[in-house]
Amino acid sequence: YKNLAKNEKGGKENSKEKSYENDNEIESNATLVTEDINSNILQIIYFDFDKSELSSISKKEIKKFLEKYENVISKFLIVGHTDTKGTKEYNYKLSIERANVVKNLLIDLRIKEENIKILGKGEIDLNIKTNDEVPHPANRRAEISPIN
């Protein structure tokens, strides 16, 4: 089991040991790489508040992820998520945008579109439970999982 978070500046943090109290405590567009066969989620990409753009470090990490698993995984599920800030409808659309951004990068990296499924969950399935309208960076993410 490997759990590693990299921030924009290239530093490393153990994501399981730190809780983020506000938006400023997690660096912009951090990428969490997990390798846990039991979790089935192999890559988590975090997003800035109200954004769906990938940082250059996130793009590099996704590329490394694909290179590592290119002979093992051929089909992918990308699930987009948001925090609870904003309306449920807006957050659902944003979660779809986040999943699509990751999907488009996978296509650019030569994964066939028919081998990628996306799902938007909006503010359902939060990593960190919060009250409505409370932003939390750990909830703003897209998860990449293999499809068997």
Where are these regions (language model features)?
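Periplasmic OmpA-like peptidoglycan-binding domain that tethers envelope proteins to the cell wall
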Residues: 59, 81-148
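Periplasmic peptidoglycan-binding/tethering modules of Gram-negative envelope proteins
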Residues: 1-76
